[in-house]
Amino acid sequence: MKPLSSPLQQYWQTVVERLPEPLAEESLSAQAKSVLTFSDFVQDSVIAHPEWLTELESQPPQADEWQHYAAWLQEALCNVSDEAGLMRELRLFRRRIMVRIAWAQTLALVTEESILQQLSYLAETLIVAARDWLYDACCREWGTPCNAQGEAQPLLILGMGKLGGGELNFSSDIDLIFAWPEHGCTQGGRRELDNAQFFTRMGQRLIKVLDQPTQDGFVYRVDMRLRPFGESGPLVLSFAALEDYYQEQGRDWERYAMVKARIMGDSEGVYANELRAMLRPFVFRRYIDFSVIQSLRNMKGMIAREVRRRGLTDNIKLGAGGIREIEFIVQVFQLIRGGREPSLQSRSLLPTLSVIAALHLLSENDAEQLRVAYLFLRRLENLLQSINDEQTQTLPSDELNRARLAWAMDFADWPQLTGALTAHMTNVRRVFNELIGDDESETQEESLSEQWRELWQDALQEDDTTPVLAHLSEDDRKQVLTLIADFRKELDKRTIGPRGRQVLDHLMPHLLSDVCAREDAAVTLSRITALLVGIVTRTTYLELLSEFPAALKHLISLCAASPMIASQLARYPLLLDELLDPNTLYQPTATDAYRDELRQYLLRVPEDDEEQQLEALRQFKQAQLLRIAAADIAGTLPVMKVSDHLTWLAEAMIDAVVQQAWVQMVARYGKPNHLNEREGRGFAVVGYGKLGGWELGYSSDLDLIFLHDCPMDAMTDGEREIDGRQFYLRLAQRIMHLFSTRTSSGILYEVDARLRPSGAAGMLVTSAEAFADYQKNEAWTWEHQALVRARVVYGDPQLTAHFDAVRREIMTLPREGKTLQTEVREMREKMRAHLGNKHRDRFDIKADEGGITDIEFITQYLVLRYAHEKPKLTRWSDNVRILELLAQNDIMEEQEAMALTRAYTTLRDELHHLALQELPGHVSEDCFTAERELVRASWQKWLVEE
């Protein structure tokens, strides 16, 4: 045995001072001194358990002792009666055997291949023993999980990565996937659980038993992220669910991982063979598959970027020429040719490397250089980790650990060790580059593009740095990284085919480069990822954004400006087509062309297909709404024009809905026979409120009443004859139904018909005569106020003329000024008490004192007060033009009318923009103070003072 080097002999004196009495220096062999000097882990362990050292001296580790692990562990577990006892015994057993392995490794008593085998089999033994103990315990508690035939169902565990390949590190976490064969329920328990519940609960307990730190440490860190759907997926899957996932969604990196998958424990049982046969076609393709090279190149690129980003210098696993590159080289051949060459289907690297050489896929010299380098690197890695039982692949920077490694690797000093290491890694890198390297030098633009790809594909953590986000604040940078990570997790839950993932991987770096260049990157990205989640399973939409950069830019700018637009696009992705043409996107339909555009749009849909007609109406509305909002955001539409467009759009929709309802009713009942003597339909729709006043907002509902002029004795002329007035009632009901039916594109509009005579208690549709009579004899003052903002939005000329005459007559009635003033003021005060001031320290733009409703009440009061003297005041139904009329007719001073108009449009503009931001209609108490003071003064002047 090689003597300790000078630095280690000096360190031995420090070790001696730590040793307890039973481990006196003179009682220790030269071997014990060497191992205790090399490994703090062994040192700590034998200080805690001196009997282990005695055992090591009397029964030194053997290469084949892994064959006894299962029996030794069973003996240790035979008296365990609870989970706490199980956890303790597993941890002590793992530590005792790891000390033996470290001893053998440090002294080179066995080959490196034997060390890897022992480490892997130890993990398998512990996992299987824990599983079997817990399975029995869970069956006693919940019953035995069985399939439909009553056959007991086991939990199968796939060991992934180095565990599966029999090449586990000294200090490694373990990657596992849990599966069970068939669905069914437990039998024999106190209550029945389905198999999914049983195995999920058992899986959770198994992870806890292995992973949870206690005073005895842990057994292994357990990583379950390689399972289908990753962290967001079920903990345990049935064979059928596994098969569906890998056939439909399995990705290249999952094929790569599955090469090494090995069933823990009884690997020759019926269910184990079934699982293995099911997975094999996914991993090993029947044809020669050269697409693997690019996939592995991409994966290697991700690793290289991680090394750069995290500053992983001196990393013997991930660095250039490291262990990972040897694994990549071997698995390239397995994945390309494994389906045709069964001899390449081995999980272990070294046997596969021999097959590769035998098949002349690599030269004998290259294969031998890789084999030697692999064993050198793995020994160095395991020695490094055994110093402190620490999961690291980074070479030490301190002199003591460098001296330890140089001695254990049989080199005189650290420079000699690093020289040999460099030679091995250079050989590996050369072979790697010849096979799958991508050594072309990058341009600056390509480098930047690569950084965006890194941001998307490499699952950066919050504390990772990346230059492309350097301009953002620390909070925004973290939020962007979190959003990307959350989006990727969400994708794992979705059924996205290979083509969809390919398109996403092309789209996302471009999207991120555009979004993250903005100062509001975090907010914008949150809106866009929410939208993308809704369309990721529909590759066509992803391709639209990927292939049309201009559409992507419009999407980003609109989503940045308005969460309302982002929400609309997320709910109705068909609207993404609108992004293709900026000429139409930012140019709403002419106000007088909505009806014609809609008519043309509906020609594409069969007239007798009600469902498609309903969808088409909603899709047209949403597309037009998007254009109006886009123009609003771009600043090409002032607030009055926005409302004009929204109002004309609503009128076009009303026209089409009435037409559709009319056709359906006539087909069923025929037409009312009084129409034989006249043209038209004898029907009108009156718009109140914002619709009547040309003041619709983005989310306004429609206040409507329905009128007809059908005589009492009219009947329909169809085969199913009904009373004429009954026909109009059913027509109105049908109209309400067409507006409110929820399709996949939502509802058309919320419709409120409570402003009809007698409100909700009255008939849904009213005759023109009854309406006139009600307004003259029964209506309250507030109903006359509402009439100020009412107009016919659909109807025959003669019914329209009749309504206009009734409206004019009611509004020009002489009224006693003081009484009217009191009634209007008291109604407003009631409204304010009910609706206003709900938010402390906030100003409700519509409902609070000095807001929009006060201006509306002022105009309504003045029209009702003075229209008897000035009938021209009844001409318009919108507030802005009523204010003009009040000034023109010398009722209000022009300066006051203009000031109120400015205040009104300013407040309306703010409401529009709050709607685009999906924010409620209230602002800080200190906003719009000038406008509110002006409105208060006007209110005081007209509705309070004598």
UniProtKB/Swiss-Prot annotation:
Record keyword DNA repair present: no
GO biological process, one term: regulation of glutamine family amino acid metabolic process
Keyword annotations: ATP-binding, Magnesium, Multifunctional enzyme, Nucleotide-binding, Nucleotidyltransferase, Transferase
SUPFAM superfamilies per record: Nucleotidyltransferase, Nucleotidyltransferase substrate binding subunit/domain
Enzymatic reactions: [glutamine synthetase]-O(4)-(5'-adenylyl)-L-tyrosine + phosphate = [glutamine synthetase]-L-tyrosine + ADP; [glutamine synthetase]-L-tyrosine + ATP = [glutamine synthetase]-O(4)-(5'-adenylyl)-L-tyrosine + diphosphate
Cofactor(s) needed: Mg(2+)
UniProt GO molecular function: [glutamate-ammonia-ligase] adenylyltransferase activity; [glutamine synthetase]-adenylyl-L-tyrosine phosphorylase activity; ATP binding; magnesium ion binding
Region (Adenylyl transferase): 449-946
Pfam family, one: GlnD_UR_UTase
GO cellular component, one term: cytosol
CDD domains: NT_GlnE_GlnD_like (cd05401)
Xref: InterPro entries: GlnE, GlnE_rpt_dom, NT_sf, PII_UdlTrfase/GS_AdlTrfase
EC number of the protein: 2.7.7.89, 2.7.7.42
Region (Adenylyl removase): 1-440
PANTHER family in the record: BIFUNCTIONAL GLUTAMINE SYNTHETASE ADENYLYLTRANSFERASE_ADENYLYL-REMOVING ENZYME, GLUTAMINE SYNTHETASE ADENYLYLTRANSFERASE
Family statement drawn from the similarity comment of this UniProt entry: Belongs to the GlnE family.
Function, in words: Involved in the regulation of glutamine synthetase GlnA, a key enzyme in the process to assimilate ammonia. When cellular nitrogen levels are high, the C-terminal adenylyl transferase (AT) inactivates GlnA by covalent transfer of an adenylyl group from ATP to specific tyrosine residue of GlnA, thus reducing its activity. Conversely, when nitrogen levels are low, the N-terminal adenylyl removase (AR) activates GlnA by removing the adenylyl group by phosphorolysis, increasing its activity.
Name of the protein: Bifunctional glutamine synthetase adenylyltransferase/adenylyl-removing enzyme
Organism: Escherichia coli O9:H4 (strain HS)
Gene it is expressed from: glnE
